[in-house]
């Protein structure tokens, strides 16, 4: 393949452990804020110029189910023409 992959930025979201500040916050809400923050941090990157959104999630059930990568990318304002997918990552 001759296509180049460019990672512009990456971030790790906070944990929502029991008793923590984010314990009652849904994973998809945290990820929407995270994606919006990445877009704000990189104003030269237009949402329409993004080729893929990949989200790693430890548990693909509940609020992290139903392809969290796709749903949060849409909620964050990334065009529906941009594929979003989830990576099952037990970290």
Predicted regions and their residues:
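Terminal domain-initiation and capping elements
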Residues: 1, 41-43, 75-78
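Condensing-enzyme catalytic core mediating Claisen C-C bond formation in acyl metabolism
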Residues: 1-25
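Structural motif
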Residues: 4-6, 51-53, 85
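Short, well-ordered amphipathic alpha-helical segments that serve as non-catalytic structural scaffolds
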Residues: 27-43, 68-72
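Short acidic capping loops at alpha-helix termini that bridge into adjacent secondary structure
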Residues: 46-52, 81-82
């Amino acid at each position: 393949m001759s296509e180049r992959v460019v990672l512009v930025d990456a971030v790790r979201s906070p944990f929502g452990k029991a008793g923590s500040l984010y314990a009652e916050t849904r994973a998809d809400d945290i990820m929407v804020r995270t994606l919006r923050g990445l877009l704000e941090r990189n104003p030269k990157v237009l949402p329409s110029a993004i080729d893929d959104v990949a989200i790693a999630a430890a548990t693909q059930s509940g609020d992290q189910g139903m392809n969290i990568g796709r749903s949060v990318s849409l909620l964050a304002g990334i065009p529906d023409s941009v594929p979003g997918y989830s990576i099952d990552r037990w970290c």
